[in-house]
Amino acid sequence: MNLNNKNRLTKDIVVYENFIDAETADKLVKVLDKHAELGTISWMPISFYESYSSVLPQDNDEHVISEGLPADIFTQIKEGIINAVASVHDLDPKIISQIGYHTQKWEPGAYARIHSDNTDEHGNSGAFTRSRYAAFLYLNENFEGGLLQFPEQELSIKPKVGMLAAFDGGFNNMHEVTLITSGVRYTIGSFWDDREEDAYPQELRDAWAAEMKETRAKQEVERAEWQELLKKGYKIDQDGNVYHFKQDVDQHD
């Protein structure tokens, strides 16, 4: 992974141009699409509208190998991201603890409203406290919209194929993803902490678990409502308005 093209946009927002090359990124998308076609991975709706997530293929995956990629490419990418995240604050990569590492697919009409990755909208910490750092690897750029924006910093990042964006996920870096107006946006998303879970008091962890359970239940209800509308041929825009759209054959169930 290439960490040489480091561009520090703010003290805690960094992009790495050509973290992976365009050919590798294109092959990774083909691998993901092949797995989805075969049903060996499933795109599951997440908390952002018309955004879907899946686990990544394991090392020695036959479709990875058939594309001529290293058998452990996804492990290599993860290790590279760990080093990139650590580099934002000159941390020892050995202390970086994985919270989430997955792929995401953003369909036309998808967006993410302004949010903090590890606090609520008022800056209060809770169940997502450990998502201190975020990093997103962009696997394609043949879509319209889908900018990563930090309104407070008046900063807008246009995804480029192979680019990695790494930043502190907290209240000081509230961010959003603008509406995908056409095409499909593929990313590898990840969240990280700089300490292990057992560094936090058990009582606090128990409180987080209870809050997480409640939050996930609410999100599941919301996602079910979204999916029901999709089946009927309707989507929801960023302002909450429902509109009709032309359905494709392979709508998500």
Predicted regions located by residue number:
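Fe(II)/2-oxoglutarate oxygenase catalytic core
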Residues: 1-164, 172-253
